């Protein structure tokens, strides 16, 4: 990984503050020093807490950090929420990143997908490849568990951070994505996180919230006072019905409706 990064000369790292991109930014900084910048897209699909973590990490690492506004909701092609939504969004965001990187004299834009990402429906990867974005972690053959282990060795706090996907992934394909829906999802997930649930997804099915949490935490959510608090708060947020997914949290559950 280090040798490959050095061969790129200078890089702009697509940085979301997640496990993979944090490790990649640290590895790039170790390999290239001041020939690295971080780029983060600010969007209503990206919670403020994640943006703040990105800002804090780049400050600690002393890496220049450019934050730009992505306006995917203004793109009707995206907001109508087709099955290739991720492709549309990634194409727009990474096109902007390439423009910024070019203006700042960076030779390549790199991003943090790993080899495990090849096993799910990931239309966003097509946009990355079309635009010539480099994926060093995939090039090095690194899987998620290895990235976590290496992050721990490097002393990165994100080594055990829970996986996160953009808030738009909580809305079923074909149902329009709106700022209001994204805000409802964000508020409901913030509630669950504040109550001690570690891995959470609140899927937005119009007036119904479908909650996914790790099965190990089912006993906590089944307590009467916990259920009542979640129900009442979700009603205040705007949902009418609140349900628990009996299979628990799983990556890409919205893709279960697709024939891929």
Where do the PLM segments sit?
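Short, low-order "capping/linker" segments at domain edges
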Residues: 252-260
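C-terminal boundary motif of the adenylate-forming
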Residues: 198-205, 245
């Amino acid at each position: 990984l280090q040798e490959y990064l050095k061969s790129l000369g200078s890089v702009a790292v697509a940085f979301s503050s997640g496990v993979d991109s944090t490790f990649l930014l640290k590895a790039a900084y170790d390999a290239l020093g001041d020939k690295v910048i971080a780029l983060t897209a600010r969007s209503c699909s990206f919670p403020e807490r994640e943006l703040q973590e990105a800002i804090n990490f780049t400050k600690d690492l002393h890496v220049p950090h450019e934050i730009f506004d992505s306006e995917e909701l203004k793109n009707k092609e995206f907001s109508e929420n087709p099955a290739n939504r991720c492709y549309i969004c990634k194409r727009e965001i990474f096109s902007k990143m390439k423009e910024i990187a070019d203006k700042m004299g960076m030779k390549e834009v790199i991003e943090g997908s790993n080899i495990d990402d090849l096993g799910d429906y990931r239309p966003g990867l097509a946009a990355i490849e079309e635009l010539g974005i480099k994926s060093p972690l995939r090039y090095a053959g690194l899987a998620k568990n290895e990235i976590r282990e290496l992050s721990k060795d490097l002393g990165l706090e994100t080594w055990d951070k829970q996986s996160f996907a953009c808030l738009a992934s909580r809305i079923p394909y074909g149902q329009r994505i709106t700022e209001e829906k994204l805000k409802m999802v964000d508020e409901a997930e913030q509630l669950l996180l504040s109550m001690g649930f570690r891995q959470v997804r609140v899927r937005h099915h119009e007036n119904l919230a479908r909650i996914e949490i790790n099965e190990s935490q089912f006993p906590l959510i089944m307590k009467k006072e916990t259920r009542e608090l979640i129900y009442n708060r979700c009603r205040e947020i705007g949902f009418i019905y609140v349900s628990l997914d009996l299979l628990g949290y799983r990556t890409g559950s919205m893709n279960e409706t697709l024939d891929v």
